Amino acid sequence: MSRFWSPVVHRLTPYVPGEQPKLTNLIKLNTNESPYGPPPGALEAIRAAADDTLRLYSDPTSERLRAAIAQAHDVGMDEIFVGNGSDEVLAHAFHALLQHDAPLLTPDITYSFYPVYCGLYGIAHQPVPLDDAMRIDVDDYRRPCAGLVLPNPNAPTGIALGLGQIETLLRAQPDRVVVIDEAYVDFGADTAIPLVRRFPNLLVVRTLSKSHALAGLRVGYAIGHPDLVEALNRVKDSFNSYPLDRLAQAGAAAAIADREWLARTTGKIIKTRIGLTSSLRGLGFEVLPSQANFVFARHPDRDAAHLAAALRERAIIVRHFRTPRIAEWLRITVGTDEECRVLTDALGTILTRNAD
């Protein structure tokens, strides 16, 4: 701490990002990155954009990228906001749309950046407990609030809501913004984007970090009513009018345009996830029904922290949270078939040795 810090900084509990080891000989299954490289067209577009024009500022409106998003999702350009990763998009949404007198509602077990934003912007926060099956009960969100923020699928559980449940929430809270964070939606859940035209209080936030394999590029976007998008732009232009550089805009536009690559790659990950779930259950793990690019699992007879440490000794990294209610769970990114085979073989060895 420092006497130069503001009171807000003194009160902050910052987000703790997933570990990014410098070693290269690891099986890295801890931060839900894609096991496959980015779309080739995205890499080509980035190389082509790395020219003399980098001396110029990037397009502050990201028009080319927004056009690609509009075509991919059949929405208008004025319904799209883009930012430097979905984390920045979410931060602007919290700042622009969710600061009210009543508390903001989020699940109690969810993306841990949400309470950080609340602390940063002075937003009262009311976590809503998941049920005993680790599911979101939409009836629990029928209460006075500043708004709702729900990831779909949820993280770290991987469990998704159906569109009917999301529509129920939107109808129950017509005067509050409902933010649906779709970071993992391409791995089997239904997007809420078709509901945007019917519900002016809906903001859908997405990222290219997961299904498009561009975590290192930092590109996210939101789709919603033009009034919501205008609010986000007002905050952006009061903070940083140029959030996306030229390379990011070019690469992201090319990635979004390649729908065939997206379908093929997410299909491979879904298939591997099904196999990984089956293998883990065969080892005695309880595995939640995931529609994301990770699984959430626990073993009834083994300590999760011990399992994570034992895997690390074998150069395999998974995510263990020490948070109440989930301290006995591991979140495991779906890697390649071979990476998942090595993981389950290692777990089999660990469990057998512990049993002796």
From Swiss-Prot:
Q: InterPro entries of this UniProt entry? A: Aminotransferase_I/II_large, HisP_aminotrans, HistidinolP_aminotransfase, PyrdxlP-dep_Trfase, PyrdxlP-dep_Trfase_major, PyrdxlP-dep_Trfase_small
GO molecular function terms here? histidinol-phosphate transaminase activity; pyridoxal phosphate binding
Share an example GO biological-process annotation for this protein. Answer: L-histidine biosynthetic process
What reaction does this enzyme carry out catalytically?
L-histidinol phosphate + 2-oxoglutarate = 3-(imidazol-4-yl)-2-oxopropyl phosphate + L-glutamate
Q: Which EC main class describes this enzyme?
A: transferase
Might you give the EC number(s) for this enzyme? 2.6.1.9
The protein's required cofactors: pyridoxal 5'-phosphate
The family database entries (NCBIfam families) matched by this protein are listed as: hisC
Its family?
Answer: Belongs to the class-II pyridoxal-phosphate-dependent aminotransferase family. Histidinol-phosphate aminotransferase subfamily.
- Description of how the protein assembles with itself and partners: Homodimer.
HAMAP family with a match to the protein in the record: HisC_aminotrans_2
Q: What is this protein called?
A: Histidinol-phosphate aminotransferase
Q: Which organism is it from?
A: Gluconacetobacter diazotrophicus (strain ATCC 49037 / DSM 5601 / CCUG 37298 / CIP 103539 / LMG 7603 / PAl5)
Q: Which gene encodes it?
A: hisC
